[in-house]
Structure formats: structure tokens, C-alpha cells
Amino acid sequence: MNLNYNGTREEKGCPMSEPTEEQLSKCAANAADENREPDEGGSEPVRAHKAPAWEDVPLAHANLVLEGGAMRGQFTAGVLDFFMDQKLFCEYVVGVSAGALCGGNYVAGAPGRSSLINVKYAADNRYLSMQSFVRTGNAYGREFAFHEIPDVLDPFDYEAFRRSPIRFEAVSTNLETGEADYHEVRDYHDELPYLIASSSMPLVSQIVEADGKLLLDGGTSDSVPLLRSMLTGAKKHIVVLTQAAGYEKKPNKLMALMRQRYADYPYYIDRLQYRHYEYNRLYRWIEREQVAGRIFVIRPPEPVTVSSMEHDTEKLLALYEQGLAEAARLWPKLQEYLAD
């Protein structure tokens, strides 16, 4: 495989009904405890050697669809941590951008890790910042975020991911065709460029080359891969969105720069130019499917104010706890949906 990403190297149980602030705090703290910080005087953080959360848990006959949204993925992180705490693991997960990164931790059975990383490194310019873009050509620092953190600072359990019974696909966009690229990731380490591509935002990221394909963020071509999920033949689909009801995407104000930057990829430019039409139409379809009872949607209950490169840890934690709360609130209905 030729992969080149153009970069340098109940308490154990969340609330089942309307949660209180105290319950949510306990649930969030419990999730974070899945990763252990170093002892004082220790040289490196070491991940606690715990069994993956999916160990000995039967999979639910359902698919999980995860929208992206950069730091808005904190909402998704909260939802998935609640699922893991309740031992809900789906047979198939498909994620875009931040949704793919959160999905990777879900597949590895690592509750707490997605939010831990975002909050812990939010103020570190090496993680996600315009300073990183100026220095490396990537706002989302590839060497730091995809190597130093998972390999040294807060180790990712690659073996747990490899052993996971959950099928996982990451979505990126092929620049030459303008179409979505759905890649089944079986080995997180060896196929990491597909995760990097999925979360490489246009203009502020270098193009990723993987198996001869030129790739960038999957949100441009398939922001919410519900159709992909349906094509698997599954009857149940849980969709986690990162925008509240009523959200409407506006035309891209940076299209002039996009056309200049990606002049060699006309199909990709077309996709960028008309993305707001496709996105808004997709959201309307999702709402119709939800009303018809064919899918189950979890989304923020109010407009999200967290920015794509948010550094305010209080806002990030609030959005994470909102995800926990919304998943807890909808849990009885979700159980009914899955049992029907």
C-alpha cells in the first residue's frame, strides 16, 4: 500500500433519564479516567492497560453515521462516550473528518479519549491552529496530532483497533473526481493517511496522497454519509449530527481562493462551489427519514457556538457534556428504536 500524507513525519453508567449537572460531571470524569496521566516525576504519559470497552459485548444490529465539524466533534465525543458507557456498539461505523477521528476511538473501545485529546491540547498551537498552518502548511498539525500524541504523549491502542469486531469506514474527497472516497480502515496505524485525509480541511491543509489518490476532507463530498450506510443493507441507522435543527449552510465566501488553489481539479472546485446546496438538501432528507422513523438522529439541541479551531476549553467541555446529556435524554427512545 502506497501511503503518503505530505507531512512530517453507571458511576460507571451515565444517567438514563434527564441528567443532572452532577451526573454528567461524574460521567465525563469516568470517561476521562479511561486514559491515565503520568505519575508525578514520570517521563511519559502511559495509557492505562484496560480491555477495550467492546470486549465481550454483543454488537447491536445497527449502523452509526458520524458527521464532521472539526472541534464541533466534541458533541459527537460526548454521544459516543455515553454509548460506550452503556455498552452500545454498532456493527458498522462510517465517519467524516472529526466524525472519523471520534469513530476511531469508538472502534478501539476507548471512552473519554476523543474529548481528552481535544481539551488537553486545545491551547497547544501544534495541535489545531493557524500558527500550525503557517509553520507546516496544515492547520491540524499532522506530526503532532497523528504521531506525537498517539505514539508518545497519549498512546492510542492500535492493537485494540485491529482486534475490534466493528467495521469502520473513513470518508474523504478525491480531488481528481470530486467524489467521496470510502475507505475501510482495518489497521489504524498503517492506514492512518486515510484518517488524516478525512480531516484535512480545504485551503488550510496539504493534499494527502494515498494509494495514488489525491484526497482532502470528506465533508466536501459527503458531509453525512447516511446513503453509504443504507447501501450496506442495514435496517437501523443512528446518525450523529454536529449542527442543530434549522441550521442552513451558506455559500462559501472563499471560493475565489478555492478556485486559485485547486485550479488543477475542476471537479473538486464544482463540489466546493455547490456544497451548500448539497448540504442543505442532505439535511432536509435526513429530517424526512427521521420523521418516517427509518433513522434515529442525535444532534445538538441548540445552535453550536464552538468554532472549527476553538481554543476555549470551557466551551469545548460544555459541548461535550451537551453530547452526553442529549444521548442520555434520548436513550429510552433509542432503545425502543433498536428493539423495534
Regions found by a protein language model. Give the residues of each.
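Patatin-like phospholipase
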Residues: N2-V96, G104-D340
